[in-house]
Amino acid sequence: MADSKDLKKIEKALGKISQQQEEILTRLERLEAEAPPAESMPREALVSFLDQFRAGEALGEASLGAWIEVSNTACVKGGLRTVQQREGMHARLLEARLKELGAAPTFEVPEAIYDQTMKSAGDCEKSDPEKIAEFVKQFPDVDAAIQPILDIADKLDGDPETQFMLRTIAQDERSTLEFLHDACQLLNG
């Protein structure tokens, strides 16, 4: 059993530890206050990203329209219609945000990529299960596929409007990819 002398030593040691903790917390708070702000994205890089993303989403809307025209699988066609509407909405939102930032949409998907995408999507010789399998093969990991969008959003603490627009678009993209993965599993086993 500890006597009063031992208890006093313990109390003194605990007091010293408590004081050291306070000093450490004070230093941490000072360091956090002095820390440089989180990495931000230069305006030109943001405008370029938004413009290219906008063009890609517009191509997505157009190519999904071509796919819907030749699709003969009801579950695919229904899902593609929803995805097409989201892609178009994203393109319009991104274009509007570009304009709000004082920029104009200028990026165009290279013609060869546009033509190949439209040809592949509208190919009636290729079945829906084949097209979906090809798409899923390009994006096997849903999280990895949307991470670049989230990485950009993480750099936009100074622009919460764009930051949260990108985060909600990423949620839509996750939904699209999950639909395509589920459809691939359903149709291809």
Can you name each region flagged by the protein language model?
Residues A2-G189:
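Non-heme di-metal
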